[in-house]
Amino acid sequence: MKKHLFPLILLACSLVACDNGFKVESGFTLVPLESQITTVQPMTGLVMWTTHSQRLRYAPVIQLEFQYCLPCRVVTGKADGKIQYDWSYFEQVLDDMKSRNHQGVIRFRYEYPGNTLVDGEPGSTAVPQYIKELEDYNETFKKNEDGPTYYADWTNKELQWFTKQFYTDFAERYNNDPRIAFLELGFGHWSEYHIYGTPLKLGTNFPSHDYQKEFLTHVDQVLDIPWAISIDAADSYYTPIVKDEQLMALNFGLFDDSFMHEHHEIAQGDGYNERCWQEIGRNTRWHTGVCGGEISYYTNYDQRNFLDTAGMYGWTWEEAAAKYHITFMIANDATGSIHGSTERFREAGIASGYNFQVVNCRTNGEETRFTVNNIGVAPIYRDAYFQINGTQSEVSLRGLLPGNSLDITIPTGLTKSEELTIVSPHILPTQKIEYEATSNELVK
């Protein structure tokens, strides 16, 4: 204890009393900041599909758009052991979102029951054509209740190799592209970790448990973009994840594509969704892995009423977002509904993800110190930094949990609110991370 006594004495001597009982360092003065959070923050909020007819009307109150993408659209073949790509289709998708000042939530998939986008035939897989032409590649077919569906052949070694290599190449090209906010990954129908309605044959129409572990471990190593898998991956029949501590330690997030349906919660009856969140989320996954999804389509009622301020099925959106620490949520069919005004979209978006608050800001003209609180419901999952007139803090806001705070020091003076901003290499130049600051008094 003696070795700490002298620094403590110096610290005590460097403080002077304030009327409110707090202390401010000698030579430092409080900086009166006035700043408000007025809109949805980048990489958070309600999400619309890129093809939505009202995407321009709602553009100012959302930050994200969703798009399924097809590997077969960007892969042209393989030569000399390397996959050949033409990314022009995908670049067009990203640039289209960017034109509306939005980032993408991207999901690559192989199977989509009944969908005709690949070649006009219902249910065709999005497996690259060069693989489909291999003699030892044989897809299976099922007239699934969700639509006719062809299934990728997971006995094929080339498909297994390609699926891993694709994300290696994707990461090399797009890891630091600010047009992409999040990735959703998976296998089966819509990449949602199931093939409900079709008999499961692990290693044939769905990847084996061993390959799933190999794949998930690989993407965790190569991807810097925050990525999520379906809560359906909690099912140990389909996946090995919840019974494998190495897999549970990976930095994946979760998406729930039937969020807020009538029996979502255990207390509401079935509770399948909540149980999945508990089993694969363990109440802490959201600390490092982004959480999102899509409002339920179990009935047409759900999407059109979840924004009711009086609540739906006993829950308001704000309560559900806080409970599950939601950062983004697809709400395509809420637009134009009685509860889905642009203002309500803005309110709901602000109620998701991170929100920062600055308190105790003081400066001596050469150095500025303040505390930042996260007053949102989730952390920010990519690096972001405070800066003053171009001088940047060395402390990232990434991972700052709700209710927690960081002390920030920037080696330059501050005279007004406009000089203090938040920057990130992972948002578009047209986007801005706001913060709340309405007090020039020291607070706890």
Whereabouts are the PLM-identified features?
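Alpha-helical packing segments of well-folded alpha/beta enzyme cores
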Residues: 89, 93, 162-166, 170, ...
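Bacterial Sec-dependent N-terminal signal peptides
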Residues: 1-3, 8-10, 15-29
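Catalytic-core regions of glycoside hydrolase
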Residues: 27-52, 98, 182-192, 196-335
